[in-house]
Amino acid sequence: MLTLLAPAKVNLSLEVLYRRNDGYHELRSIIQSLSLCDRLSFSPAKTVQISSDSPDWQAEHSLVSKAVALFSEKCGQGRGVNLTIAKRIPLVSGLGGDSSCAAAVLKGLNKLWGCGYPRWRLMELGAELGSDVPFFMMGGTAMMEGRGETVTPLPTLNQMWAVLLVPEIEMPPDKTAALYRNLHADSFSSGEISDKLLEDICQGKLSYSSCFNVFEKIAFTLFPDLAKYRWQFLEAGAYQIFLAGAGPTLFTLLKDKNMAEKIYHNLCQKGHQAYLVSTLGPLD
């Protein structure tokens, strides 16, 4: 049996530069992987069998099934796999769980079926599945550009602690598309925000003032209950709070583990779905 971890991520910066002629948006984003991980187990089988320990996870609505189908078409026609997923990353949370699992599927089947594709080829296949998938082929700290297909590894951040707060807000199935639909001319930026953050990271530091998410204002407008959770996060002791990806997860990053633990425990005592995790370096 082959077992792989699929880590969550947060966007330290997320800029939309413009809308492209092909209908996609040009992105510039610095992404950081986290120690909150799903676990995927692969074993040989005569047919494709996919299952999860989460009753709410549906294979037919996930990128996992699409990743298996795509890789089968490219390399594994007629081959099977018994794939089981232990879900730990909350569904539809903005933490990239579906994309991360899809990347792990491509890597896992590449090993299980002995296809021998190099990482760059797996990243190409990942780009066919979703914008975040190529990043999860390497993880760590990286710059993502284009519509997600261009990923450049960055110096690994010194370990930091992240507290995640997952609001109990019902999100529409087209959450991300809704955020993109609400972008306007003033939402676009030049990429300078990410450049400033990149400069900080290369100097071995992280400036909270350089963190940015273009979707934050839009999300708080479309989903006004987010404001209540942000306020409760502040009451728990956080002082810099950011939106994770397309949300609704909120997070804070700290160098002080004791402070992170205090905030985490304060949130848990209030009955919130919260996680205390650390930043991760590049994947093998």
From Swiss-Prot:
Keywords: ATP-binding, Isoprene biosynthesis, Kinase, Nucleotide-binding, Transferase. One of its GO terms (biological process) is isopentenyl diphosphate biosynthetic process, methylerythritol 4-phosphate pathway. Pfam families: GHMP_kinases_C, GHMP_kinases_N. GO terms for molecular function: 4-(cytidine 5'-diphospho)-2-C-methyl-D-erythritol kinase activity; ATP binding. ATP binds at P90, L91, V92, S93, G94, L95, G96, G97, D98, S99, S100. Belongs to the GHMP kinase family. IspE subfamily. This is 4-diphosphocytidyl-2-C-methyl-D-erythritol kinase. The gene is ispE.
